[in-house]
Amino acid sequence: MILHAQAKHGKPGLPWLVFLHGFSGDCHEWQEVGEVFADYSRLYVDLPGHGGSAAISVDGFDDVTGLLCKTLVSYNILDFWLVGYSLGGRVAMMAACQGLAGLCGVVVEGGHPGLQNAEQRTQRQRSDRQWAQRFRTEPLTAVFADWYQQPVFASLNDEQRRELVALRSNNNGATLAAMLEATSLAVQPDLRANLSARTFAFYYLCGERDSKFRALAAELAAECHVIPRAGHNAHRENPAGVIASLAQILRF
């Protein structure tokens, strides 16, 4: 079994760019940014429970990274960058820390490196279970209307929230709930030590209005790019800013 993905081929000899979306996104999420880099081959992945991979269920991060590795092999991707947002960034960091042959580097936008104590994990598990129950039982428009009121999305205006609620409500609530629980921050290890000891290039992107993740970025041994005029979802709020940073990272 492999993950559903869209592949776009570029020039031979350059590494692939493998894009991983955030929770409730899909393989289209990164394409406005990725298609600027047409010289590179691009793989836009649907994570389990999402898009074309909605029917794929997992029990945890090991299952996700295993599926990602099989997907890369199936496309004969030998050299690549992982570019991930939020959940996709956490998957990218997890996979990279486990060791991936052919990995050139990791670019994470607003991805959490992991909680650091049991109390935080317990609180997060309780919160994620409550959200998962809502995703399973309530209309998605109602759930996402509340989801995008969370403090991390404070930089969004009303129009942006309405657009995201409409877009994300096309998902399957049950499969989103299962993926939310399987990849909860409550079950993700703290990756800070592994990231400090890494052997791969590591870059971190965060919006200038995303105070929570700017603070987290300062804890990581990574080159940080602060995206102007953007909050947590920087590649959506300021795609040109993310494109500029990615071009600098890739020396495009």
UniProtKB/Swiss-Prot annotation:
Q: What is its EC number?
A: 4.2.99.20
List the catalysed reactions. 5-enolpyruvoyl-6-hydroxy-2-succinyl-cyclohex-3-ene-1-carboxylate = (1R,6R)-6-hydroxy-2-succinyl-cyclohexa-2,4-diene-1-carboxylate + pyruvate
**Pathway(s) per entry:** Quinol/quinone metabolism; 1,4-dihydroxy-2-naphthoate biosynthesis; 1,4-dihydroxy-2-naphthoate from chorismate: step 3/7; Quinol/quinone metabolism; menaquinone biosynthesis
Task: Tell me the GO BP annotations in alphabetical order.
Answer: menaquinone biosynthetic process
- Top-level taxon: Bacteria
Q: Can you name one GO molecular function term for this protein?
A: 2-succinyl-6-hydroxy-2,4-cyclohexadiene-1-carboxylate synthase activity
One Pfam family this sequence matches: Abhydrolase_6
Record key words, sorted: Lyase, Menaquinone biosynthesis
Q: How does it assemble?
A: Monomer.
Function in brief = Catalyzes a proton abstraction reaction that results in 2,5-elimination of pyruvate from 2-succinyl-5-enolpyruvyl-6-hydroxy-3-cyclohexene-1-carboxylate (SEPHCHC) and the formation of 2-succinyl-6-hydroxy-2,4-cyclohexadiene-1-carboxylate (SHCHC).
Q: What family is this? A: Belongs to the AB hydrolase superfamily. MenH family.
Q: Which PANTHER family match?
A: 2-SUCCINYL-5-ENOLPYRUVYL-6-HYDROXY-3-CYCLOHEXENE-1-CARBOXYLATE SYNTHASE (PTHR42916), PROTEIN PHYLLO, CHLOROPLASTIC (PTHR42916:SF1)
Q: What is this protein called?
A: 2-succinyl-6-hydroxy-2,4-cyclohexadiene-1-carboxylate synthase
Organism listed in the record: Escherichia coli (strain SMS-3-5 / SECEC)
